[in-house]
C-alpha cells in the first residue's frame, strides 16, 4: 500500500486531483451511494431545475460495467499519462496556466454538451488534453498497440479510431479533439505562428492561488523557453517545428 501511496503522491498536483476524482465519482455511482441519474449532464435538469453540479459530475463520472470497463481504464491511463506529461513538461512550474487550460477546455465542452445533449464529459476533456500534448510534440515518434509507430500529431485520431472499435462511438473523442485544437490554435498557433493577437489570458486570481514556481512565466501567449530558443534560431518569424521545443522524453 505504501508503494501505491508513494506513486499517487508523485503525480503532479492538478493531474492527481483530476485522476482521483475520475476514480472516486464512478465508484460512488457504482456503489449506489449516489444515484447515477444525478451524475449525468442533462440539459433540462441543469437549465430548468438548477442542478448546477451536473457539468462537474459529468466530467468525472463514467458508467463502469462489463461492457465499458476496458474503455474506462484505457481513458484513465490516457488522463494520467498525458496530463502528467503536459503538467511537468510544457506547463512545468506554471500550475495556474495549466489549470486555466483545463478550465477553458471544460467550459467549451460543457457548452457543446448542453447543445448536443451529451451526458458524459470525461472522455472529451481527456482527449482535449491529449490533443494539446500531441500538437506540442507533433514530430515525436510514439508507439501504440501492436508495435505501431507514428508521429504524435496523429495520435488523437488513432485513439479516436481505437475507441470507436472498443466503444462504438467517436462523438466524444471528436469533440475533445476539436476543443483541444481550438485551445492550441488560440494559445500557440495564431499568436506565435500567424502573428495574431492573444485571445487567452490566465486570470490573476489563479496566479495568486497557484503562483508560478522556479521563475515560471505568467501569462498565456508567452512560449516556454525551449520554443523561444527555437524561434530565435529561425530568425523570430515564419513557420517553425512545433515539436522540437516540447520534447518531453521518449515514449
UniProtKB/Swiss-Prot annotation:
Phosphoserine found at: 201, 226
Transmembrane residue ranges: 16-31, 70-89, 95-115, 123-137, 155-166, 171-189
Membrane topology designation: Multi-pass membrane protein
Compartments, as annotated in UniProt: Endoplasmic reticulum membrane
Alphabetic keyword roster: Acetylation, Endoplasmic reticulum, Membrane, Phosphoprotein, Protein transport, Transmembrane, Transmembrane helix, Transport, Unfolded protein response
Topological region Lumenal: 32-69, 116-122, 167-170
Motif SHP-box location, chain numbering: 241-248
Entry's Gene Ontology cellular component terms: Derlin-1 retrotranslocation complex; Derlin-1-VIMP complex; early endosome; endoplasmic reticulum quality control compartment; late endosome
GO molecular function, one term: ubiquitin protein ligase binding
GO biological process: cellular response to misfolded protein; endoplasmic reticulum unfolded protein response; positive regulation of protein ubiquitination; proteasome-mediated ubiquitin-dependent protein catabolic process; protein destabilization; retrograde protein transport, ER to cytosol
Region (Disordered): 229-251
Main location: endoplasmic reticulum
Residues modified as N-acetylserine: 2
Modified positions (Phosphothreonine) in chain numbering: 202
Pfam families in UniProt: DER1
InterPro entries recorded: DER1 (IPR007599), Rhomboid-like_sf (IPR035952)
Residues in compartment: Cytoplasmic: 2-15, 90-94, 138-154, 190-251
Function according to Swiss-Prot or TrEMBL: Functional component of endoplasmic reticulum-associated degradation (ERAD) for misfolded lumenal proteins. Forms homotetramers which encircle a large channel traversing the endoplasmic reticulum (ER) membrane. This allows the retrotranslocation of misfolded proteins from the ER into the cytosol where they are ubiquitinated and degraded by the proteasome. The channel has a lateral gate within the membrane which provides direct access to membrane proteins with no need to reenter the ER lumen first. May mediate the interaction between VCP and the misfolded protein.
Record text on subunit structure and interactions: Homotetramer. The four subunits of the tetramer are arranged in a twofold symmetry. Forms homo- and heterooligomers with DERL2 and DERL3; binding to DERL3 is poorer than that between DERL2 and DERL3. Interacts (via SHP-box motif) with VCP. Interacts with AMFR, SELENOS, SEL1L, SELENOK and SYVN1, as well as with SEL1L-SYVN1 and VCP-SELENOS protein complexes; this interaction is weaker than that observed between DERL2 and these complexes. Interacts with NGLY1 and YOD1. Does not bind to EDEM1. Interacts with DNAJB9. Interacts with RNF103. Interacts with HM13.
The family this protein is said to belong to: Belongs to the derlin family.
UniProt name for this protein: Derlin-1
Source organism of the structure: Pongo abelii
Gene: DERL1
Amino acid at each position: 500500500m505504501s508503494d501505491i501511496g508513494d506513486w499517487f503522491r508523485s503525480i503532479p498536483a492538478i493531474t492527481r486531483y483530476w485522476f482521483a476524482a475520475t476514480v472516486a465519482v464512478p465508484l460512488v455511482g457504482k456503489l449506489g451511494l449516489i444515484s447515477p441519474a444525478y451524475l449525468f449532464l442533462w440539459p433540462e435538469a441543469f437549465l430548468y431545475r438548477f442542478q448546477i453540479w451536473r457539468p462537474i459530475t459529468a466530467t468525472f463520472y463514467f458508467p463502469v460495467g462489463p461492457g465499458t470497463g476496458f474503455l474506462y481504464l484505457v481513458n484513465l491511463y490516457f488522463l494520467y499519462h498525458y496530463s502528467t506529461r503536459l503538467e511537468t513538461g510544457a506547463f512545468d512550474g506554471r500550475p495556474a496556466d495549466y489549470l486555466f487550460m483545463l478550465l477553458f477546455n471544460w467550459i467549451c465542452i460543457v457548452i457543446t454538451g448542453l447543445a448536443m445533449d451529451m451526458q458524459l464529459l470525461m472522455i472529451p476533456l481527456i482527449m482535449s488534453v491529449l490533443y494539446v500534448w500531441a500538437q506540442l510534440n507533433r514530430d515525436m515518434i510514439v508507439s501504440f498497440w501492436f508495435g505501431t509507430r507514428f508521429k504524435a500529431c496523429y495520435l488523437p485520431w488513432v485513439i479516436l479510431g481505437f475507441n470507436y472499435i472498443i466503444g462504438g462511438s467517436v462523438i466524444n473523442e471528436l469533440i475533445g479533439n476539436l476543443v483541444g485544437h481550438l485551445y492550441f490554435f488560440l494559445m500557440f498557433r495564431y499568436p506565435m505562428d500567424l502573428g495574431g493577437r492573444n485571445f487567452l489570458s490566465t486570470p490573476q486570481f489563479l496566479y495568486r492561488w497557484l503562483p508560478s514556481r522556479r521563475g515560471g512565466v505568467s501569462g498565456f501567449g508567452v512560449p516556454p523557453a525551449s520554443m523561444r530558443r527555437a524561434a530565435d534560431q529561425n530568425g523570430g518569424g515564419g513557420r517553425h517545428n512545433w515539436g522540437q521545443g516540447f520534447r518531453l522524453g521518449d515514449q
